[in-house]
C-alpha cells in the first residue's frame, strides 16, 4: 500500500482526506456508513462557549448553482463536546480537529484551552463568526480583529492553530497575512460564500435567516 501520509502543521495525517467542519457533525453521524479510521482527520462541527440552538428553519435552500445553508452554529457547547464526544472520537483511529467560534477574543482563548485539554490534535479558528465588540461584524472582515482572534486562540492552544478565512472580503490575502502575523500555523480556505434565494411568490428570502 502506498504511503499517503501528509504533514499538517507538524501533525502527521495518514492521508490528506479531512472531513470538513459542518455536516459531518462529530463523526458519530457517519460511522455506520464509513470507517472513520480510513480518513486523515475529522474537523468537528463548530463549537461555542455556550450551547447554541442555531437558526430557525428553513435552513437549507437549493439554487440552480448549488445549495445554501444557514445552520447558525448549532452545537451543544464546548463543555458538552469535551465530556460526551471526545472520549468517543479518541477511539476513532484518526486525528481530531476542533473548529472553534467565539464572539470575543477572550472566548477564542477559552475555547482553545478547553479543546486542547480534551486532547484534540489541531484547532481550526472560525473567524467568520460575529465580533460583538465591533457591532457584529465578522472577525475575518478586518485585519485587526483577525489578529486579535488568532492571538487569543494561540494563547490558549497547546496544539497547532489553523485559521479558517472568510471569502466575503475585498482582499483575502490581506486577511491571510494578518492571521500569519498573529501566529497562525496554517490557513484554511474558505468558509461560506454568502448567498440568498428569493421565494418569488412570497417575495421574501427562502431562508429564515435571509442569507446562507
Language model segments and positions:
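Alpha/beta enzyme core
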Residues: 41, 57, 91, 103-212
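N-terminal capping/small domains of soluble enzymes
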Residues: 1-96, 102
Amino acid at each position: 500500500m502506498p504511503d499517503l501520509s501528509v504533514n499538517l502543521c507538524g501533525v502527521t495525517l495518514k492521508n490528506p482526506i479531512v472531513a470538513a467542519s459542518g455536516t459531518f457533525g462529530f463523526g458519530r453521524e457517519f460511522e455506520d456508513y464509513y470507517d472513520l479510521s480510513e480518513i486523515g482527520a475529522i474537523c468537528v462541527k463548530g463549537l461555542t462557549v455556550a450551547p447554541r440552538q442555531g437558526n430557525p428553519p428553513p435552513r437549507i435552500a437549493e439554487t440552480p448553482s448549488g445549495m445554501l445553508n444557514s445552520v447558525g452554529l448549532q452545537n451543544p457547547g464546548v463543555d458538552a463536546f469535551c465530556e460526551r464526544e471526545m472520549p468517543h472520537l479518541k477511539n476513532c483511529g484518526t486525528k481530531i480537529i476542533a473548529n472553534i467560534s467565539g464572539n470575543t477574543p477572550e472566548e477564542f482563548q477559552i475555547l482553545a484551552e478547553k479543546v486542547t485539554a480534551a486532547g484534540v490534535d489541531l484547532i481550526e479558528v472560525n473567524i467568520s463568526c460575529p465580533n460583538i465588540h465591533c457591532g457584529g461584524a465578522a472577525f475575518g472582515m478586518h485585519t485587526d480583529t483577525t489578529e486579535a482572534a488568532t492571538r487569543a486562540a494561540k494563547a490558549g492552544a497547546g496544539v497547532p492553530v489553523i485559521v479558517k478565512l472568510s471569502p466575503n472580503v475585498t482582499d483575502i490575502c490581506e486577511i491571510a497575512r494578518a492571521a500569519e502575523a498573529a501566529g497562525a500555523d496554517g490557513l484554511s480556505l474558505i468558509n461560506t460564500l454568502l448567498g440568498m434565494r428569493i421565494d418569488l411568490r412570497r417575495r421574501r428570502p427562502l431562508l429564515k435567516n435571509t442569507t446562507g
